[in-house]
């Protein structure tokens, strides 16, 4: 089961990580001063990621 985990870092900021069903962390967030802000970011990702495009910047030329 994939899941978001919210936690507090050593500085007291709230962060989240997205974990795969095998327990591997797929990505983690920046720090947020308020827990509500971290929750809002998670909800935004859930709402907006399904239709997101993948842009490969390694193939672009200047």
Curated annotation (Swiss-Prot):
Name the family. Answer: Belongs to the UPF0339 family.
InterPro entries membership: DUF1508, UPF0339_domain, YegP-like_sf
Name used for this protein in its record = UPF0339 protein Atu0232
Q: Which organism is it from?
A: Agrobacterium fabrum (strain C58 / ATCC 33970) (Agrobacterium tumefaciens (strain C58))
């Amino acid at each position: 089961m994939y899941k978001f985990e919210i936690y507090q870092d050593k500085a007291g900021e709230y962060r989240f990580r997205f974990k795969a069903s095998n327990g591997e962390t797929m990505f983690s967030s920046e720090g947020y001063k308020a827990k509500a802000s971290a929750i809002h970011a998670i909800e935004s990702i859930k709402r907006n990621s399904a239709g997101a495009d993948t842009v490969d910047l390694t193939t672009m030329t200047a």
